[in-house]
Amino acid sequence: MNWTGLYTLLSGVNRHSTAIGRVWLSVIFIFRIMVLVVAAESVWGDEKSSFICNTLQPGCNSVCYDQFFPISHVRLWSLQLILVSTPALLVAMHVAHQQHIEKKMLRLEGHGDPLHLEEVKRHKVHISGTLWWTYVISVVFRLLFEAVFMYVFYLLYPGYAMVRLVKCDVYPCPNTVDCFVSRPTEKTVFTVFMLAASGICIILNVAEVVYLIIRACARRAQRRSNPPSRKGSGFGHRLSPEYKQNEINKLLSEQDGSLKDILRRSPGTGAGLAEKSDRCSAC
């Protein structure tokens, strides 16, 4: 499995994340993916071939292994990491869409040179507005995926300690046979480590949701106490609702002033326009 591509995609999200989000990404890639790739896959690499039962009945080893280990630990953790990391791509797509809109606005304003467009790509997007909702939803989905996989792991493998010996009486085994698990101590250590890392990620996700909500409430309270001025700088300001509303009001005022000048210069035309408007309103 190629984890480098996933890391490259999520590194772009890391630029626009909170401090807690950056810590979460470090835990994901250093304490989980690196351990999974470097150590855990080698420990579980020979799990099926080294699962030996004290019988020569054909097929008994396979059915006993499937009964006690329906899903490999490594494959379950790999699927968990992929699904947990996927919601962060929503933030990356939202940021890319927002930057595309900024570039489009710059071109319409006559600032479409490569220098300005590159500056839009480099600057950090603030987590506010619709991006705030996208970010919170992605964190909530991460939290749900972590909790669901922890519960699935508990259902599949009660307890965290890897057993050394299991007794199996599933057909086609002739009777109750003893089956031996390879490297039980190593597997127990890595299982505890991965479950602890998953628990840390759950705590980080909860803390990030609380932090985002508190910061959003603080910003709203600050806006009510100190209303923002009409002036602003930066590309992020150009996408704010206040900026858009100011631009619309400016265009409407300019059009209103132009219409008044036309009516003042040619009263006949103004009367005709008024008559047409009355007819339209009557219709």
From Swiss-Prot:
- Record topological domains on the Cytoplasmic side: 1-22, 96-130, 215-283
Q: What is the effect of changing residue 15 to W?
A: In CMTX1; moderate
Q: Which Gene3D superfamilies match?
A: Gap junction channel protein cysteine-rich domain
The entry's stated outcome for residue 230 to L is: In CMTX1; localized mainly on the cell membrane forming gap junction-like plaques
Kindly list the places in or outside the cell where this protein is found, as annotated in its UniProt entry.
Cell membrane; Cell junction, Gap junction
The keyword Protein transport is annotated on this UniProt entry? no
State what changing residue 85 to C does. Answer: In CMTX1; mutant have a higher open probability than hemichannels formed of GJB1 wild-type
Tell me what the record says results from residue 95 to M: In CMTX1; non-functional channel
User: In the UniProt annotation, what is the result of changing residue 201 to R?
Assistant: In CMTX1; severe
The record gives the effect of mutating residue 280 to G as:
In CMTX1; forms channels normally
Impact of changing residue 215 to Q on the protein? In CMTX1; non-detectable levels of hemichannel activation and non-detectable levels of electrical coupling
Transmembrane intervals: 23-45, 76-95, 131-153, 192-214
Consequence of changing residue 37 to M: In CMTX1; localized in the Golgi apparatus but also forming rare small gap junction-like plaques
Q: Which disease is the protein involved in?
A: Charcot-Marie-Tooth disease, X-linked dominant, 1: A form of Charcot-Marie-Tooth disease, a disorder of the peripheral nervous system, characterized by progressive weakness and atrophy, initially of the peroneal muscles and later of the distal muscles of the arms.
What does the record note on quaternary structure?
A connexon is composed of a hexamer of connexins. Interacts with CNST.
Q: Which protein are we looking at?
A: Gap junction beta-1 protein
Give the species: Homo sapiens
- Gene giving rise to this polypeptide: GJB1
